[in-house]
Amino acid sequence: MNNETDIRKIKKVGQVWRADEVASLEMDFFSDINVVAGFPIPLSNDERAKKIDVLRMLCPHPDATYLIRVEGDSMIDSNICSGDILVVDKSNRNPSENEVAMCEVNGEYTVKFVRRHDGKSWLVPANKNYPEIEINDGDEFNVWGVVTFVIHQPQSV
């Protein structure tokens, strides 16, 4: 299957962008300053800021990376929420058990952990309200890529 066919199928699920078609974005980055999530610390002036290419940081392989919007809550316990944008690297199609993967099963796409045991593959959600999906011998199954970053807005309290 070629990339254009893949993209057409995925676009039926939601929004998809090729990373190499997204304009570069440079922003100020304070690499020598750590912000604590405890008591406030003084922050120096903007002279310490360095420029960082956000797209290059998120997408080390832009020609093989796609941005895909999530629908659903099967991965909520891994902090992947409906509406988030996933950065998916297609150059890695062999996820570890701790990496979230975008997978194609019988022509449909899903985001799950891929676990292999007893000669079988399972798609494992990060939400106890969803069952694990066993990949059977007759199923068409492919790992489409590994999720490298999740972009989402912080939840308000």
Describe these PLM feature segments.
Residues 1-76, 109, 131, 149-157:
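Short, positionally conserved secondary-structure boundary motifs
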Residues 62-66, 96-101:
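Short, hydrophobic/aromatic-rich segments at coil-to-beta transitions
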Residues 80-81, 94-95:
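Short, well-ordered loop/turn sites that connect or cap secondary structure elements
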Residues 83-84, 99:
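Structural motif
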Residues 87-88, 102:
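Hydrophobic beta-strand signal
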Residues 97-110, 115-119:
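Short, compositionally biased
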Residues 115-157:
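Glycine- and charge-enriched low-complexity intrinsically disordered segments
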